[in-house]
Amino acid sequence: MITAITRTALPRATLRTSLATMSTIRAKHTLPPLPYAYDALEPSISAEIMNLHHTKHHQTYVNGLNAAEESLQKASADGDFKTAISLQPALKFNGGGHINHSLFWKNLAPTGSAQVKVPTSGVFYDQVQADFGGFENLKKEMNAKTAAIQGSGWGWLGYNKATKKLEIVTTPNQDPLLSHVPIIGIDIWEHAFYLQYKNVKPDYLNAIWNVINYEEAESRLKAAQ
């Protein structure tokens, strides 16, 4: 049925051109190295969690994305429209997981480092003051909205290019943030905190601010503006 509808909606030549484009050989995605040691975020996030989160969970998304893209490439080359369309959820889930975690690792920094000191000046500081009235208000609002996510997902501080403001947004599962430029992301999947904080999300959310990389947030905001 999907194949029949697709063929009716688009000329055959157009479909062949589109599928040929998708079948272009791509390099495999790889797990990015952490910019710090697994125990660098302790006591806020344990070394055990960081090791499992990075080497097992993130690696699974990378593997899933590579497998889905390989299947899509084959389906596209074969003109198998139904299979190509059916792969979209896997591409979204695993691709989102890879993107989200790659951003997440970089917006964290070692305990006690210069990067985790709450800024008192700069572009990010000024924007937070203007949009939230200060960092404590930002933390309170972002923690509340992230904790309220039903099931798994992500809490984001994103920059809205239309309004030129920082806004708090949540996304379900591994959906990437598309409506805003990601500035800070917080993983609220259980694998990010359960071994250490059990089911007490507020404790995890309060602790993670001790290792937020404000220098990375400053850099992302400057690039977004």
UniProtKB/Swiss-Prot annotation:
Binds 1 Mn(2+) ion per subunit. GO terms for cellular component: cytosol; mitochondrion. Gene3D superfamilies: Fe,Mn superoxide dismutase (SOD) domain, Iron/manganese superoxide dismutase, C-terminal domain. Coiled coil: none annotated. It catalyses: 2 superoxide + 2 H(+) = H2O2 + O2. Residues 1-27 form a transit peptide. This is Superoxide dismutase [Mn], mitochondrial. The gene is SOD2.
